Amino acid sequence: QETEFKVRYRVDGVLRTERSLPKHMQNMITARIKIMGNLNITENRIPQDGRIKTNINFQQIDIRLSTLPTVYGEKIVMRILDASNVATDISKIGFTEKNEQLFRKMIANPNGIVLITGPTGSGKSSTLYAALSELNVEGVNIITVEDPVEYQMSGINQIQVKEEVGLTFAAGLRSILRQDPDIVMIGEIRDLETAQIATRASLTGHLVLSTLHTNSAVESISRLHDMGIEPFLITSSLIGSMAQRLVRRVCRDCGQTVPATEREKEIFAENGLDVTTIRRGIGCSACNQTGYRGRLAIHEILPIDRTVKDLILARASANTIHDYMKQQGYHSLLQDGLIKVLEGSTTTEEVLRVATTE
């Protein structure tokens, strides 16, 4: 800011101010962080990206740096990547029993594409890493192309995208296919070329895992079509799509059972669920008076069965496919979230914050 220097933390997806420091400390702190990240401390006119590796309590912590010049000096974002917190077990991601079975069935296929969709910060990478951990067994060749490589995994060959030297997702993927892979993970399908190569790879005997930025599982089909992938290729290659969001967990220390409001009862009834009580955190020192501590994922899974393939080939709208999902008993993001409210894991407000009502 113009007269002060703010330090803010994003905890469980919510940004809060930790403290404000005198303006004269800004340049000193900025320079020190840039030195630690091997950045050019004399360059403050352009954005820079760096990395700090450190050990805290005998745990290796990776910190990603991003600097940005603003009118009041450089802004720095430090993203903490703690390898010890990476989910290596699909059962610990927060799936309902039905969704866990659906997801395991999708990634058990020997070939095809499995897509995980959602906005930035929705836990897509963590879910991909959990899937890779379970698939990473003796006799399986797994190669990934990522931007960036967030967590280094033993037994998996990981490629870092470097667009400045021409190593794009598409270029990396073309090279990967000459390396005899069984499973390929693409950090993100961003363009038509990457989508085409991923589709081709899935049709030639490879299991491809990747992510897309769409709001729902159904919209991933529309996105591939909008990129230029023909419907017959989508139906031939796509195994399934899963949308994901993160919601805050009710604090274990201060969570209390309270009666549901009339509005909550209406929302649950509209989604075929009954509710009388929910759990809500009242705030304590453990959760910094927020009532929440930690996060869990809510999901929406669309397996591509014969009927869905016919709908895709007929260029049916996303709403038509969504209606079919409801008829088959598949849960939307909202319904999955409300089920987790009933379990006492989160609150209705959290679910409505990330999942739209229909």
PLM region descriptions:
Residues Q1-E358:
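Short, flexible helix-loop junctions that flank or precede catalytic/ligand sites
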